[in-house]
From Swiss-Prot:
Positions contributing to NAD(+) 1 binding: 99, 106, 145-153, 186-189
One matching Pfam family: SAM_2
Record family assignment: Belongs to the SARM1 family.
Name used for this protein in its record: NAD(+) hydrolase SARM1
Description of how the protein assembles with itself and partners: Homooctamer; forms an octameric ring via SAM domains.
ARM repeat extents: 53-96, 110-149, 151-189, 192-231, 233-276, 277-310, 311-350, 355-398
Gene: sarm1
Gene3D superfamilies assigned to the protein according to its UniProt record, in alphabetical order: Leucine-rich Repeat Variant, Toll/interleukin-1 receptor homology (TIR) domain, Transcription Factor, Ets-1
Primary location: cytoplasm
Function noted in UniProt: NAD(+) hydrolase, which plays a key role in axonal degeneration following injury by regulating NAD(+) metabolism. Acts as a negative regulator of MYD88- and TRIF-dependent toll-like receptor signaling pathway by promoting Wallerian degeneration, an injury-induced form of programmed subcellular death which involves degeneration of an axon distal to the injury site.
Domain TIR: residue ranges: 552-695
Organism classification: Eukaryota, Metazoa, Chordata, Craniata, Vertebrata
Domain SAM: 408-472, 478-537
Reactions catalysed: NAD(+) + H2O = ADP-D-ribose + nicotinamide + H(+); NAD(+) = cyclic ADP-beta-D-ribose + nicotinamide + H(+); NADP(+) + H2O = ADP-D-ribose 2'-phosphate + nicotinamide + H(+)
């Protein structure tokens, strides 16, 4: 009893510290009213399911909350706009303070958000969002964004979806966009049906329209909304996203250099879309997917977690239900999905360890998936992230398994058995000298009769792990024609059949003549559907060989300065790509190689050359006699190749011609197009005329006029 009293008093002390000078800054009239209302309440019994420390905070907050909602109701009835704004501000302050509380923040905030609904506050907010007074609409939407916990999302989906959809039509209202994009971010987590309803009524169109903008708050909400739609919306919503070119519009977000959280959620969204085999090729074609791995490899999970802890939206981390949606990426076949899911789990482990809640990862099954990656994956980035996550979870990190399974001796088989949890059978496997060859040919009958694996479920577990091993194994020593990759191209799961086919004498040349019966009896492909798909793939016409003729070059090469021109360059890429142009834009990649040669070759092979002239874009070219600057090299290559050069300016001041090296000074004679963020479609139409019509350098007089504009400003 004494111990309980001590614990309770310590929680009260922690609660009182909330009201120190470190509290969030709010309008003075709100602070004074809150101070008057927050008198210490009498001790009350703890509500069922709520811990004492959570109840202690609620006892101080709920009276003020009830008072604010009463004020909100009365001021709405009387039409007192100033009093309405005060009540909304008080409620917002209580909610925001709850979300940033350490340890108990999520539980306190959820109780407060639910209480707002139960006391009628949510209904009032939906009504206020329809009033003619725009300031009330703005502030009501801002508060609604903060209180959309699970039960409140249910209410809005049933009673207020029309209100939200009406607000999404106000695409040009920048202040409203900040809140409505946040509301959509939450609502795309609700159900597949709600997401589909939002998409079919224009909400996704609005999100994609806002992806063109520059407001970091709106862009962050858009990135998270798209990742939520992809993760929680199911196959139907993923198909709708592809039809509306969401994969393409994710490119500017993933390419952004301004905000890592924007890039991260954009990469997560495109990785989830690519995990759907039905639309994988369309996602790959967008070009966004190749941004994922280099970006993730450049991040530090601990630093990223600290940034999330600084954000009120993310500081509590994700729930178990949210994290479970990462498992299909971890267990999938796309490297990008594994990479971003492993990184996300590292970040969440860092947050959950502060909350002393790392057991959540064992409960959702993430630990086994991470161990499988460590054992089998050959990608250094994914492997290191999986190891790091396991260490932070205080889990055992398994050893990397040698990939040349056909060449395994019995010792390697023993190691593998121990790491997958079948050490009880190690002795029997050792007695029978089971090596890699025998392991790859093992059948369920062998497990029962020779290896003593009598339990049916145990055999299923073993065969499941064996399928994973067969899928990851390297067959190069026995598969000279690379049948393994051909099977994986038909379906990544079919790689497990490689050894059986190769041992039976099948290769890429004669597979077209194989029958269903031969696949079953000789190659041991027992799944009839798999046999049908393999035979169908074998009878498809082979792809034309391009070794003799070089593939066609891109329609457009986009040259830009990374520090200031990334966003405009990425927008141009998407606009042109959606209009049927093939576009090359330099993307930072991990693989080594002759980078300079590849880049110059791309300029030479392109028909058009768009030069993005953002702020200070040519500064590094000045005095660059040795041509070490990349933009300088690209411009000179385009000039020498007589490309159709189209400069696009954005906050750019044309330099003195004498300040540029002589080999690129003629670039100043080209007619440039001034970019307009507000009228992007009109600007793109002008660029299209330049690309499809005569070269821009034929109009030097127009160029001189255009170049004077920024200086006049």
């Amino acid at each position: 009893m004494f111990l309980s009293l001590v614990v309770y008093l310590s929680k009260i002390c922690r609660y009182l510290s909330m009201f120190s000078s470190d509290r969030l800054t709010v309008p003075e009239y709100v602070s004074s009213r809150l101070h008057n209302r927050r008198t210490a309440p009498d001790p009350r019994a703890v509500s069922p399911g709520i811990s004492t420390d959570v109840q202690a905070v609620l006892d101080g907050s709920l009276p003020a909350l009830r008072s604010a909602i009463r004020t909100l109701r009365s001021s709405k009835d009387t039409g007192d706009l100033e009093e309405t704004r005060r009540a909304i501000a008080e409620t917002f302050q209580l909610v925001e303070e709850a979300w940033v509380l350490p340890t108990v923040g999520r539980r306190v905030a959820e109780e407060i958000c639910n209480r707002i609904r139960l006391d009628g506050g949510l209904e009032l907010l939906l009504q206020l969002m329809q009033t003619p007074a725009v300031e009330i609409t703005y502030e009501s939407a801002k508060l609604l964004e903060q209180i959309l916990v699970s039960e409140n999302r249910d209410y809005v989906a049933r009673m207020g979806l029309g209100v939200i959809l009406n607000l999404t039509r106000e695409q040009e209202d920048a202040q409203l966009a900040r809140s409505v994009s946040g509301i959509l971010e939450h609502m795309f987590k609700h159900t597949e049906e709600t997401s589909a309803q939002l998409i079919t009524n224009g909400a996704l169109d609005t999100i994609l329209y806002w992806c063109r903008g520059t407001d970091p708050t709106v862009l962050r909400h858009c990135a998270v909304a798209l990742s939520n739609c992809a993760m929680y919306g199911g196959h139907r919503c993923q198909r709708l996203m592809i039809e509306k070119q969401a994969a393409e519009w994710l490119f500017p977000l993933a390419f952004s250099k301004e905000d890592e959280l924007i890039r991260f959620h954009a990469c997560l969204a495109v990785a989830v879309l690519a995990a759907n085999r039905e639309m994988e090729k369309e996602v790959v074609k967008s070009g966004t997917l190749e941004l994922v791995e280099p970006f993730i490899a450049s991040l530090d999970p601990d630093e990223f977690a600290r940034n999330m802890l600084d954000s009120a939206d993310s500081m509590q981390g994700r729930t178990a239900a949210d994290l479970q949606h990462l498992l299909p990426l971890l267990d999938g076949t796309r490297l990008e999905g594994k990479c971003i899911a492993a990184f996300y789990l590292c970040v969440e482990t860092s947050i959950k360890s502060r909350q002393r809640n790392t057991k959540i990862f064992q409960e959702i099954g993430a630990v086994q998936s991470l161990k499988r990656i460590v054992m089998y994956s050959s990608n250094a980035t994914v492997c290191s992230l999986a190891k790091r996550a396991l260490k932070m979870m205080s889990e055992e990190v398994p050893r990397r398994i040698l990939s040349s399974v056909p060449n395994w001796k019995s010792g390697e088989v023993q190691t593998w058995l121990q790491q997958i949890g079948f050490s009880a059978f190690s002795e029997r496997f050792q007695e029978l000298q089971v090596d890699g060859d025998l392991l790859l040919n093992i059948t369920e009958q062998d497990l029962i009769q020779d290896l003593g694996m009598t339990s049916g479920l145990t055999r299923k577990r073993f065969l499941r792990d064996l399928r994973v091993l067969k899928t990851y194994a390297n067959y190069s020593t026995c598969d000279p024609n690379n049948l393994a990759d051909w099977l994986a191209d038909a379906d990544p799961r079919f790689r497990q059949y490689t050894y059986g086919l190769v041992q039976s004498g099948v290769d890429r040349n004669n597979i077209v003549h194989i029958t269903d019966q031969q696949l079953l009896t000789d190659c041991h492909v027992e799944n009839g559907i798999h046999r049908a798909k393999i035979l169908s793939a074998a009878r498809r016409p082979s792809k034309p060989c391009l070794t003799d003729s070089q593939p066609k070059g891109p329609d457009v090469f986009i040259s830009y300065r990374r520090t200031t021109g990334s966003q405009l360059a990425s927008l141009l890429k998407v606009h042109l790509q959606l209009r049927g142009f093939s576009v090359f834009i330099d993307v930072e990649k991990l693989e080594a190689g002759r980078f300079e040669e590849k880049l110059i070759t791309s300029v030479q092979r392109a028909r058009n050359f768009i030069l993005v002239l953002s702020a200070n874009a040519l500064d590094k070219c000045m005095g660059d006699v040795a041509m070490k600057d990349w933009v300088h090299k690209e411009i000179v290559t385009a000039l020498n190749g007589k490309k159709n050069i189209v400069p696009v300016t954005d906050n750019f001041v044309w330099p003195d011609p004498t300040s540029l090296p002589e080999d690129m000074s003629t670039i100043l004679k080209f007619n440039g197009i001034k970019w307009s963020h507000e009228y992007q479609e009109a600007t793109i139409e002008k660029i299209l005329r330049f690309l499809e019509g005569c070269p821009s350098q034929e109009k030097p007089d127009g160029a001189k006029t255009d170049k004077k504009e920024p200086q006049k400003k």
